[in-house]
């Protein structure tokens, strides 16, 4: 089966990227992390000192960009870029631009791969409604916060669990209530519970993808 599109949606910190990478590697698909596109755009905005609150200036700047690279880079994970990303991702014309970029990337990659797996927050509900298989990742906020806290501590970075939990709840509220492409469960989506071990998650994924 070729030209397979699989969407992986879920809230911040739910493990979408890890799950999408696993699917891409084990089912020979191209993986597109939509979050990287937003982070790359945020990085460009910071580098060019564009005031994102000035919508006219921001729209003009975005129109000057032909292509956003989907390649990941550790510098894109900087907190400054993450904060800017969360702000610009709520702007309707920014989301429309990134959605268009995703369409271009997937169209090109389907020429070389048997399919694509894309992770984000509105992939199955908005960007790729035609996805053959739609997954929605579920993890309780407290578990997501604990995982993030542990991750930061292991990196040698300072971390306060209560602060992380608060940020996750705020991000969830923002994603669910934004006007443009809110976080919703796509029609026909298969729930993947990622609160336990990753082995348990893998078993659910294998069951969901048995038709491909």
Q: Regions from the language model: what does each represent?
A:
Residues 11-14:
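ATP-binding Walker
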Residues 37-114, 122-125, 142-146, 154, ...:
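ATP-dependent small-molecule kinase phosphotransfer cores
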């Amino acid at each position: 089966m070729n030209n397979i599109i699989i969407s992986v949606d879920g809230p911040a910190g739910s493990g979408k990227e890890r799950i999408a990478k696993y699917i891409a590697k084990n089912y020979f698909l191209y993986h597109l992390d939509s979050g990287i596109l937003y982070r790359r755009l945020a990085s460009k905005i910071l580098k060019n000192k564009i005031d994102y609150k000035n919508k006219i200036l921001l729209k003009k700047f975005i129109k000057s960009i032909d292509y956003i690279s989907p390649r990941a880079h550790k510098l894109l994970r900087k907190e400054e870029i993450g904060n800017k990303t969360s702000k610009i991702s709520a702007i309707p014309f920014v989301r429309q631009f990134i959605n268009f970029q995703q369409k271009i990337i997937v169209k090109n990659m389907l020429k070389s791969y048997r399919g694509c797996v894309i992770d984000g927050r509105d992939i199955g509900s908005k960007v790729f409604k035609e996805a053959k298989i739609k997954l929605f990742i579920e993890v309780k906020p407290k578990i997501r916060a604990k995982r993030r806290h542990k991750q930061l501590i292991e990196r040698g970075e300072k971390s306060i669990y209560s602060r992380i939990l608060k940020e996750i709840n705020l991000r969830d509220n923002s994603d669910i209530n934004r006007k443009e492409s809110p976080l919703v469960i796509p029609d026909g989506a298969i729930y993947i519970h990622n609160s336990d071990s990753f082995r348990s998650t893998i078993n659910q994924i294998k069951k969901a993808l048995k038709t491909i």
